[in-house]
Every structure is written in structure tokens, then in C-alpha cells.
Amino acid sequence: VAPVPEPFRRLLPFAALVALAPAQTRLLRFPDLHGQHVVFTYGGDLWRAPLAGGTAARLTSSRGVELFAKFSPDGHTIAFTGQLDGDEQVYVVSSEGGEARQLTWYPSRGPLPDRWGYDNQVYGWTPDGTAVLFRSLQNAWTMNGCQLYTVALPAAARQRGALPVALPMPVAGAGEFSPDGKRVVYSPLFRDFRTWKRYQGGWAPDLFVFDPATGAAENVTNHVRTDRDPMWIQNRIWFASDRTGTLNLWSCDLQDKSVRQETQSTTWDVRWPSSGGPKDDRIVYEKGGELCWFDCTTREEHAIAITVPDEGLLVRETTVDASGLVESYALSPGGRRAVFCARGDVLTIPKEHGDVRNLTHSPGAHDKHAVYSPDGAQIAYVSDRSGEEQIWLVDHRGETPPRQLTKGLQAMLYEPSWSPDGKWIACSDKDGVLRLCNVASGELCVVADESRGQLRDHVWSPCSGHLAFSMTGQTDLRALHIYSLADKSLHCVSRPLSNDAGPTFDARGERLFFLGLRGFQPRLTTAYEFDFQVDRCYGVYALALRKDLPAWLPVRTDEATAPPKKDEPTPKNDGPKFEQPIAIDFDGLADRVEQVPVPLDNYAGLDAAGDGLLYRRRGGVYYGRDSDQPATLHFFSQKERKSEQLASGVSGYALSPDGTHVLIRTGSTWAVAEVTLKGKDGQKTLDLRGLPVPKLPAEEFPQIFHEAWRRYRDFFYVANMHGYDWEALREQYAPLITHVRHRSDLNYVLGEMIAELNVGHAYIVGGDTGAPPRPSAALPGLR
């Protein structure tokens, strides 16, 4: 059993607290109150609890989420936004629980990105309790065109109500009616789900009081920072604002327009405040995952300790099919097995006979970039099960536990590559540092440091004595380099004005093939203007590593030859044997270049294999759509001096370590082919159906949290993280992870942590939410 990683170990005390019932539950969201009860969302469902705290009672349970619950003025009914049938609609349910009734039926927009929030978001009720107030996209293309609507409750339980009625404001985000129902306080902007803390700019919402009778609108907050979540309580407008750096409660006197700060939180935002009604002087909100209520008269805050007896159905361990979640793949020597990294696990699949093997079974780690050793006995891969990405080794049968090979690395790692003798592994990181790792000892040494990006095309010579790769040269173009292990020397082997990448050694160690941007093959475009389109300019080239080598494709000439004498046996070729490193004549190497006779094109992959070259050709690149030509995989034979297409629609491929077979990916199909001119025939399709991977959200959620934290640490555009203590922010938000019961809550925690960096367009999206299928509805285009 692997040791608990240090970042995960920090969560164990909190996990222990959660396990001891009754304990306070956190991540209670979107609260509302009436009388002596609060309603809120936890784990995607609605719950009700006493205002004084205690144990919550479940109100809803569905595959989708239920959000934005609002008590009716009499407290008997709760309106909410729900996904009961797949898309977001407005529902009502008794405050004691029971069957929910659907009020809206117009097809909602979605699923929307997290930063957009939800369609048909409920905001409250009309003061007389006859209709529900909500915001909808039904007449808008984007969120900046939303409107507020009311929809009346039907007279009978099984009767459908009237159609929604739009309020007269042309665009609107959050809103609430005045106590007499004659005016509305609202925000014309909606960006309540965008993770922009302390934002100042054109998208900072202000609050307006609108009078439908006169059409007059008055800005009552008028500040450069965010003013949101309006509540109309007697003669004051209450709202949330981050004017002091953190969202707090503020209020505005409607008579003299004076504004005052009501709460003083400096660590956690006051989020989604909601009042008990226009005559109730209490406001409930979430802060740090907990619920609090504020007495508007005494101006005092009261914490609410609530225990949610959630059965944890959404975080139970299950087995899922990961065949559609393949992240990386490789082929074994001889092509008899393939290794896949899918949904964080390392699995091997037979070409034809045998079982599927999950070698890591690690729902709490992200395992990726798995590759077979040259002898097929081990598999190297990258994993963060120690808390940072390191190189790990596992037996190809999975009979022994995985072994951590490297220690102390602190950056995202890319694909490792084995030396042919199995003694070394080369691996680079996001900083462009290329290292060699001794397989026996785990010791590391730096080979190169790319200062302008990543270094990911490193390849080994067949003798294991040299490593070739491309990195930025003095002219800011990619240049080929060769590193010699014997004397630890690094040689640039490209011309200064060449743009070369994708090197690959031939099996004899005599040549280094590569892709070079050395041609110019413009096409004319005449559809809108007479202009040049310059693509298809990459060629395939070869460098002769020794001065005495003949051309790879010598000039052919027909000559009369005599058969070999009987006492002179025909030479037998058993393939190259390397007892010592191959010799490379670096003097003049950049000039010993030969172009392989394949046309200039858009190439995206090159490997020396068999008696020739394997390469992938793709179509032209277009803005906003896929290429008009499918990517194809080809093999060029040196002996036959011709090329044959092996597959079409190829999204990727992986060559076996011995170069005899190739794993080809075409869409969701995987096939193994021999690397020959006739490799198109006899391809064997792999069966990935039902690829079994354990799903254990209780372990996956902490891993996702810490990996997201590392991604920002590694890739944020300035090293000082905008001056914030990024480690301290992880410590602040990590305890919330043990309370996550739904993937949307994990996204919320991640978004809040990242928002602390005070940067725009840094969003969290996606994830396995388990949302039900959305209904398909056709609209006639009529109103």
C-alpha cells in the first residue's frame, strides 16, 4: 500500500472529524430562511434545518441538482431551480417535502459552463406569493442578455400554470421586488458565477431601483467594485460587495443614499445572502462553507451549526468504463500488449488473447504517460501519488506494488522514454528541463534546459549512448541537439536558420531523421482576395552521423553483376549489435543532410521503423473548424523507395520499442498493425469496451484539488502568484474538500481558491457531474 501523500495527509484530521457523527457539515450553499428554518443545497439536493442549528432533513433527491431554494412569503412552499428531468426548470415543493411541481417548460440552455451559472435561476417571489421571480435565457443568446420573469403558481396541483411574463427591464441579473411589489431592485449585469474576486471594470455590477410605472431607474450603489445579491428590507437595500477586498454585507439607505458596511469578514466571502422577507430583519448567507444569519437590527452575526445526514450515494465506490477517457497509450515490444492510461489508472490490454490488467488501482492518484521497458518486463509512468509528480515503475503483470523511482521533483512531468538497454529513463518537465534517471538508483542528472517552452521530442540512439531532441536555438527557431552520455557534451546539429524538430534514430545508429520547416510551397487563394496560403512546408530529412556513410537512398543505376562464388557465402544480417556507443562525427554534421523523397506537407509525427520511416500527415489548419482532410499514417520503405498509407482518420499512434508494430488510434478505435508496406492488411482491432477502472470520489476529490493547485503553481504567468501566498491559500481551502458530495461543489471550491489570485478568465469547467440526460426539444421559431 502506497504511503499517504503529504498534501492528502493534511486532510486526514478533517476527514476524521467528518467521520464522527454528529459533526458540523460544510459546503452548505444557496441558503434562504423563513421563521425558524433555513433551506439550502448540499450535495446537489435541497435540505431544511432549524435556524438554531441541528440535523437537517432532506427535501429533494434526484440525479440532477436542485439549487436556489426560496421560501414563499407564507413559508409553506419552496421554489427552486432543478434538473429533475435533465434541464434546468423552475419547480415548487412543500416546505415539508413531497412531490415537486414544474412551473416552467421552455427548453433551457445548457449544460452551461460553470462561469455562466444556470438557466432559469430562481430569485424569490412576488410579495403576495402568487408568482415566482426567476432569471432566464429564453430570449437571450448570452448571459448579458438575460431577463427577469415571473411565473404564476397554478390553481390546482396537477394543473399547468400560465406562461412566464418578462419584467420590463431589457436585461437583468439578480433582482428582488420592493415590499409593496411596485418596484424592483436589480442588477443589469450577471457575472455571479465568474471567479473574479476584487474585480474592477465594466463588468462590475451596480444595483438599480426600477419603477415599471415610470420606466425610471436609479443607481443606488454606484461603485467600481462588485455590488450583487440585492435584498429589499423595509427602507434599505442590502447587498454583498467586495469594496474592502472581501465580499461582505452592506446596506444603502434609500432616503439619503448613504452606504454602510454591515459585516467585517476578511478571510471568507459572504456569499449568496438571502433575507427572510421584506418585513424580516434577518439575512442568511454562506461563509467558508458554513451558514450564518445576520440580525439587521442588532447588526450581529450568528453561526449555524448544521449536520447533514447525507448517505453519500454520490461518493460511493463504483467501477466505471474508462474506454472513452484514455489519456495516453503505448505498445509493448512485439506489439502483443498495449498499455493505456485512462481516468488516472494504468491498464494493459492484449492484442488478442488474455485479460485486461489494471496495474495501479489508484483512484487517489493521477497516473499517466505509461511506457513499456525495452524488454517488456516493466512499465514506467508518471504519478502524483506521493503529492508531486514523480516517475514510478510497475511490473508488467501487476504482481508487485508500484515502486517510486524519482524523488524531489516539483513540476509537471511529460512522457518518459527508456534507453534501449533499459538502464536510463529520460523525462522532461513543464519548465523545459530534460533529465536522465538511473533506473537502478533513481539518481537524476540534467541534460538540457529549454528556456522558451517545453522539450518533449527526446529520443534515444539504439546504442543508448546518445539522446537527440530539439530546443530553441540562438535564432529562436527549433534546432536539433545531441547529448552524449559518455562525456556529458551537448551538440547543436542544425543550421542557425533551420527550423527542425521530431528527431528519430535509425536502427543502426547511422542516421538521424527529422522534420524540417525548410521548404516553401505557397498556394493561391482567390475566394475573397488574391493572397498566399503558406502551409504544407514540412519535409522529412536525414542527417548522416558519420562522414563515411553513403547516401541513404543512393543514385540507382542498372549494372551487370555476377552471382556470388560458391566458396563465398551470402552475407547474413542479424541486425545491429552495440557493444559500445556509436561513433558520431559532429564536425560538419549539420551539412550532411539528405531529403527523403516524400512531398512537403503538414507532418505531425515521425519514427524510424523497420527498413524505413513511419510518419503522420494531417490536413491544413482552419480557424473554427476541423481540417477538410483526415490525418493519415504512412510507411516509407527504403528498400522499395515508396510509401503506403496504413490508416486514415488517425488522431495518434505509438510505435513499439522494437519498431515492429504500431498502435493506431482512429477516433475511438484502436488497432495494432505491422510496420511494413502491407501493414494496412491484417490489422488487429483492440477491444476496449468496458475498460474497468475504480471510481472512488472520496479519494479522487482531494487528488483533483491538489493537482489543480499544482497546475496553477507551475503555469501561472508570474512566479509570485500576484503577490498572494499560494501555499497558505491551499491550506485555507483544503479542509472543505472532505465535505464535497457533488462534483459541482468541488468545482466551486477550486474556483474560489483560484479566484483569490485576482485574475480573470481562470475558470474551472467540466467534471463527472452525473447529470441526467437533457431532453431534446424542437422549437418552431415562432413567438
Residue ranges and their predicted role:
Residues A15-A23:
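Hydrophobic h-region of N-terminal signal peptides that target proteins for export
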Residues Q24-L28, G54-A56, D310-V326, I582-P599:
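A short helix->beta-strand "capping" segment at the edge of beta-propeller domains
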Residues Q24-A49, L325-L347, P597-R618:
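Beta-strand-rich domains and repeat architectures in extracellular enzymes and scaffolds
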Residues T41-W47, S61-E66, A79-S95, E99-N120, ...:
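A flexible loop/linker signature enriched in serine peptidases of the S9 family
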Residues R260-S274, H491-G502, L600-A604, K642-Y653:
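Conserved blade-ending motifs and adjacent loop-strand segments that build the rim/top face
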Residues D32-G35, A69-T77, Y123-A131, G175-R183, ...:
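Blade-terminus and WD-like Trp-Asp/Gly-His loop motifs, strongest in beta-propeller folds
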Residues S332, G588-E644, E727, E731, ...:
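Long hydrophobic segments that form regular secondary structure
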Residues A155, Q404-K407, G422, G620-Y622, ...:
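Flexible, low-complexity junctional segments that flank or bridge functional domains
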